[in-house]
Amino acid sequence: MRQSVVMYYSGITNSLRLAVFDVIWASPPCETFSTVRRSNIGRNGYTKESIYADMIERGVPILRKTQEIIDYFQPKTWFLENPQTGLMKNYIDPFISFYDVDYCKYTDWGYRKRTRIWYGGVQNENFIPRLCEKDCGFVENNRHVMHVTGTPKGKSSKGQGGGNNRAPRYRIPSVLIQELLSLPYTEDLCLPSDT
C-alpha cells in the first residue's frame, strides 16, 4: 500500500508542477492509528509491538507523504482530517491549529464520529466547530442511534467496517466542508453522495 501511495504521489507532482491549488483536503487512512486496534491484541498473532510497528511502518509514512504533498503544492488553504480518538495526533506538530467536530451536528446520518481537522492557510474566521452534547436529535437512551458503520446501535455488524461497505466510515458531511470554506449551501459540490 505504501509503495502505491508514493508512486501515485510521484506521478502527481510530475504532472502538476505548475498547478495552483486553492484547497487541499487530505484524509489519510486511519486504520493504523486507530485505538480500536488494541482490542485485537492476543488475537491472530497481534501484539502491542506488532500494532505499533504497523503504525510506524505504514501509517506514519503515509501521513508524512500527505504532509509533503501539502507542503509541495502550497495551497491557499489545507485541511488534514482523522478520527479525534486516533493516535495520528501524536505524530502531528502540536502547534498546528485544529478543530474537533461531531458529524451528527452536520448531517442526519445518526452517528457522532468525533473528527479532528488540522488546518493551515486562509480560513473562514466565522467557522464555529460543533460538538454534540447529545442534542443532535439522533440520541435514544443516552446513545447515538447508529454506528459509524451505518448499522443501528444494538444490531450486529461485522467489524468496524460494517462488512464490505466501508463508504459510511469514510464519508464527510458536505455541510461541514461548505461551512469550513464559507461556501453557500448547495447540493452541487462535486462530492460523493452523502447517502
Question: Which positions does each model-derived feature cover?
Answer:
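Conserved active-site and SAM-binding loop architecture
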Residues: 1-195
